[in-house]
């Protein structure tokens, strides 16, 4: 039975949710303060990470934690104010990263990740967006033999447990695959089933265009205006009030504050990240993670995009692009980088949950309120797959993959 549904948030997750529901015949309005794909979804590395069957765990060894505390590497940075504000969530993150618990979380997470590529491909075909997709995998490069050996052992375990494919490259094979690299490297793990998108923001725009073509409404407005109205909900747009029977909260890094106003204390926190494009340098054939340095090099339409590691900071804290500047220094040693396109780095935020799994399902105390947020590093990857899962739940049918593990109710009422 068709319903009136309002989706708050036009990033990858929200746009895919609105599109999936509209494709199923529901009357759907997508509301955001900006055009689709202009916030978090614009700024990632553009990788659909089929290999990400286990979410990123917090380091458990004290040497790694000390390196983070002393800011010795580029993979993690923090503001003290942000660290203190997120301390309860980070403690829960630490506990969830214990090996046995993380292995269980990984098995649950893998059930959703398994559909990430096929679900994107389904929507890309409908949206005519195949020109943005490259099926060339994700390459993780290593500078030391010790790190490479550990990575190969880890990749072998993931292949055995989840069936995902990879290729092992020694230093000579890596040099042949990427002639632009001018440093001797130990080798690489090349995940073969991951895909790359040459313009992440453009892909969200294509999905939004398909949503409109199929009869969906896209409006500019303030999600904070949402309030109960009769048997449903109402929010304010620039064109006037919008009413719906059901509402989906897909506000990315802003979801935690919004949920707290409704009385929910879900353990959500923010990891910020930076990027910048470079042109006029060497050609890189495949998106590459410099694994021992903590940054990504992604060939994209605007140039070679460098994306930074994670920064624990308040959502509205001033930019501190230490990681990106350090990544640029490392990248210039690795290959001819060219000149920066933007005068200042881009800054965005990832919405993370303490147990590393997204929240997908019904809000426990508010009938008609649905949640699709907290995807961490994988909102871009999981947008279509989590949209399909939530649509199954809204319609009351049998979910196409496990749903209970992602229910907001796991954090209590």
Spans of model-derived segments:
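Glycine-rich FAD pyrophosphate-binding loop
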Residues: 23-43
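Active-site substrate-recognition segment that forms the wall
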Residues: 47, 52, 56-95, 225-228, ...
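C-terminal catalytic lobe of FAD-dependent flavoproteins
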Residues: 162, 200, 292, 336-413
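A conserved short coil-to-beta-strand element within the FAD-binding core of flavoproteins
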Residues: 169-177, 219-233
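Rossmann-like flavin
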Residues: 87-209
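N-terminal Rossmann-like FAD-binding beta1-loop-alpha1 element of flavoenzymes
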Residues: 3-30
């Amino acid at each position: 039975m068709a319903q009136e549904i309002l989706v708050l948030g036009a990033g990858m997750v929200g746009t895919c949710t609105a599109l999936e529901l509209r494709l199923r015949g529901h009357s759907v309005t997508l509301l955001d303060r900006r055009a689709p794909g202009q916030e978090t979804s614009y700024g990632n590395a553009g990788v659909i990470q089929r290999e990400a069957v286990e979410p990123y765990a917090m380091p458990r060894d004290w040497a790694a934690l000390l390196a983070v505390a002393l800011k010795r590497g580029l993979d993690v940075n923090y503001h003290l104010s942000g660290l203190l504000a997120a301390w309860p969530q980070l403690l829960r993150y630490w506990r969830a990263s214990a090996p046995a618990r993380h292995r269980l979380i990984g098995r649950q997470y893998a059930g959703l990740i398994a559909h990430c590529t096929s679900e994107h491909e389904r929507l890309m075909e409908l949206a005519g967006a195949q020109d943005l997709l490259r099926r060339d995998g994700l390459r993780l490069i290593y500078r030391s033999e010790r790190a490479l050996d550990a990575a190969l052992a880890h990749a072998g375990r993931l292949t055995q447990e989840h069936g995902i494919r990879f290729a092992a490259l020694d230093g000579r094979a890596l040099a042949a695959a990427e002639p632009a690299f001018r440093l001797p490297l130990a080798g690489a793990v090349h995940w073969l089933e991951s895909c790359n998108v040459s313009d992440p923001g453009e892909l969200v725009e294509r999905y939004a265009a398909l949503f409109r073509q199929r009869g969906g409404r896209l409006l500019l407005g303030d999600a904070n205006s949402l309030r109960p109205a009769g048997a449903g909900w109402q929010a304010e747009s620039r064109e006037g009030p919008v009413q719906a029977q059901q509402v989906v909260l897909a506000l990315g890094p802003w979801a935690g504050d919004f949920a707290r106003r409704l009385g929910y204390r879900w353990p959500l926190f923010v990891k910020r990240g930076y990027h910048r494009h470079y042109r006029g340098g060497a050609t890189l054939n495949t998106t590459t993670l410099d694994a021992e340095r903590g940054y990504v090099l992604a060939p994209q339409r605007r140039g070679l995009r460098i994306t930074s590691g994670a920064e624990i900071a308040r959502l509205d804290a001033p930019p501190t692009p230490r990681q990106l500047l350090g990544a640029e220094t490392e990248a210039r040693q690795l290959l001819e980088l060219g000149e920066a396109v933007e005068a200042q780095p881009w800054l965005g935020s990832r919405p993370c949950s303490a147990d590393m799994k997204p929240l997908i399902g019904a809000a426990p105390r508010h009938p008609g309120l649905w949640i699709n947020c907290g995807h961490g590093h994988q909102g871009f990857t999981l947008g279509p797959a989590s949209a399909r899962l939530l649509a199954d739940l809204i319609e009351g049918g049998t979910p196409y993959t496990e749903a209970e593990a992602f229910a907001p109710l796991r954090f209590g009422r």
